[in-house]
């Protein structure tokens, strides 16, 4: 089938799938378009690159089951706050109840604003969610990974290793296999906190946290890096300092100091892509990347992939008013996937075919491969 014929099929599929996606849509994409959407997160194989970032949309089993039914590749659970065996949390200020999330337009895109922080229920409740997440992961229905905010000391202060030990061991026991897959969150509210006022302090965290976690269990660790309140050079320096992680999620939302809220939109993706586009941001030797920030189209997925991201994490795009999705039925997750994959102009299939026509993406054994977009570029 020619490239132009693929586009005709794509327009048909876009209309056809407005009510429901094929149960295994990556297989459909491979069969019809000869495009292999396989991706990776934390060295785990994924059927396609689209996952859900940590937050209010991944704090109960019902949400995860809905995501699995829709065909989402992976989800990161709401971030739990580390504690010691007595239940003491040095970062307890982050374990507060979320205010209502507000979805609003920001320029040409969308952002979600809220003032809440981490998991505000009991640690036992979180362990129960991790056990359920493991069941989904083990069945192949959905890779679902826990997220933690651990103690972060000031310069000259020691790490509270008892919190690292108790929390990591408990999560490893609940997870069900070794290694434990885990994401360490450096949140936008942390970026806005006085704790993150000093560059040397932030770099110490990034260098030392991986070994502190791995001292207590066999962990494959992703670190979700914040957008610090410094320049692009420092963002790249943060990536280098975090080289002890197994993967990096780049980068968390921006923080509005005056309003005291985190936000996204085009300002976020512009900064993230600019940092990743620097020679220091796209080194060949570094932990694998997962992109995040204002991803609302397959075209933006490709932009992150071209800068080395082998998967992406979305949050806002799963919360739009229903009328903003082209699909007419299904969960928000399913409607979002429909737009991200099948949109005839800006969907992932369309943009990969566009790059094939431009001779910047080539078939191997008759197929285009998403992961070929992520190959390191020459500096």
Model-derived features: where do they sit?
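N-terminal capping/small domains of soluble enzymes
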Residues: 1-169
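Alpha/beta catalytic cores of nucleotide-metabolism and tRNA/nucleoside-modifying enzymes
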Residues: 1-30, 101-102, 120-121, 267, ...
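Glycine/Thr-rich beta-alpha phosphate-binding loop at enzyme active sites
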Residues: 24-33, 183-201, 225-285, 321-331
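Structural preference for beta-strand elements that scaffold enzyme active sites
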Residues: 49-51, 74-76, 141-153, 179-183, ...
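Glycine-rich beta-to-alpha transition loops that act as phosphate-gripper elements at the mouths
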Residues: 54-57, 149-151, 225-230, 286-299
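Catalytic cores of alpha/beta
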Residues: 61-66, 159, 230-242, 281-285, ...
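Alpha-helix-loop-beta-strand connector modules within alpha/beta enzyme cores
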Residues: 100-104, 119-141, 198-221, 261-289, ...
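Metal-dependent enolase-superfamily TIM-barrel catalytic cores that perform enediolate-based chemistry
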Residues: 159-220, 226-227
